[in-house]
């Protein structure tokens, strides 16, 4: 493609000039939400965990939703011999405070936009109501042995493309209710905003 970086040095130079990755996530989220009939507005200040305010008219009545956008890089298991490479095609992680979304508001949603290291955007996004996301955080393993932060490992299953959040940081041999939470109902489910 004309104008695309050709060498690893050119790719690195482009990455160094690129804006903050969160901006990429918010821009992708705005486009996706606009395609779903919402009018997205950016907040000048990131207050109350809100990056984007959505507005639309339904039956001549305005509706509003608040979105916290999380952009996360997806990594493909680098070695086919790794245990996770047998189960997952891509993995992203997010570290959360245990009570990060404890203050529930029915209008608040958490949207994950994923990108690969080459800046290609994953076609799937995850959209969680804040209460559901808080409950998932509570079930997730500790980030470190001490402290209240939780480690959320979001992974796309190799077999069927369904999304899961791992319940353990230890090796497991199959995807089941003990090893993972199936969160595929939140993948590209824009109707959760209704």
Tell where the protein language model's regions lie, with residue ranges.
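Mixed-charge (Asp/Glu-Lys/Arg
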Residues: 1-48, 53-194
